[in-house]
A protein has these predicted regions:
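Charged, amphipathic alpha-helical linker segments immediately N-terminal to NTP-binding catalytic cores
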Residues: 1-12
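Conserved GTP-binding G-domain of TRAFAC-class P-loop NTPases and closely related GTPase folds
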Residues: 5, 88-225
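Pre-Walker A adenine-sensing motif
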Residues: 16-28
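P-loop NTPase motor core
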Residues: 35, 50-68
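Short amphipathic alpha-helices and their capping/turn segments at secondary-structure boundaries
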Residues: 38, 78-87, 123-127
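The conserved Walker
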Residues: 42
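Conserved lysine of the Walker
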Residues: 46
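Switch II (G3) loop of P-loop NTPases
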Residues: 69-82, 100-103
Length: 225
């Protein structure tokens, strides 16, 4: 006599098929999405950049061109949450407020904000999760930096700095300090941009370049670059 499947077994089998179908659809959707992780110390301007993204992409991306952006808190007490966002990252946008070279952390009055950002950037670049992950460096608040640098010398943060206290030389020095920590000499992809988070046109221009990085990463993953 043949074995007759019970109603419960049939229901369980049907549920299993639905779950498998849903998981497959989720994997396919995830493969079409680029995952961007926004990192940086507190007060770097991440929240403002997220607001600009909402303005620029008010209607969102197309179904076939989707980017998911994760903004996590930058203060020390919030960084322990970062590890939960590390898996499957397409690229990292690391944001540093270059105008805060003469300020200290809100949570630690003995630590310079620029020094903290340098330490954090180095730890991200050397993290095992991001060995092959492209990093986009936003040197943010360039407008405030340009207004401040002629009045407040860069030597407050970098005693070894011997250049002029003007935007061109001082900003180039800061850029080099970050890029020297990135491991770019070992082939790691790091893309630097000077940004003003309150300038929508500037952020749109920069984010167009970020999109190019995402496309390049996707092609590299497919062996086409």
């Amino acid at each position: 006599m043949g074995c007759v499947e019970s109603k419960e077994a049939k229901a369980a089998s049907a549920r299993s098929k639905v779950i498998d179908k849903t998981l497959k659809a989720d994997r396919e959707e995830s493969s079409r999405q680029a995952k961007l992780l926004l990192l940086g110390a507190g007060e770097s301007g991440k929240s403002t950049i997220v607001k600009q993204m909402k303005i620029i992409y008010l209607n969102g991306y197309s179904k076939d061109d989707c980017i998911r952006m994760f903004d996590v808190g930058g203060q020390r007490t919030e960084r322990k949450k970062w590890i939960h966002c590390f898996e499957g990252v397409t690229a990292i946008i690391f944001i540093v407020a270059i105008s805060e070279y003469d300020l200290t952390l809100a949570e630690d009055q003995n630590t310079n904000r620029m020094v903290e950002s340098l330490r954090l950037f180095r730890s991200i670049c050397n993290n095992q999760w991001f060995v092959e992950t492209s990093i986009i460096l936003f040197l943010n608040k360039r407008d405030l930096f340009e207004a401040k640098i002629t009045k407040s010398p860069l030597t407050i943060c970098f005693p070894e700095y011997s250049g002029a206290n003007n935007y061109e030389e001082a900003s180039r020095f800061i850029q080099n300090r970050f890029e020297n920590l990135s491991g770019c000499e070992k082939g790691k992809d790091v893309y630097s941009h000077f940004t003003c988070a309150t300038d929508t046109n500037n952020i749109q221009f920069v984010f167009d370049a970020v999109t190019d990085v995402i496309i390049k990463t996707a092609l590299k993953d497919c062996g086409l670059f």
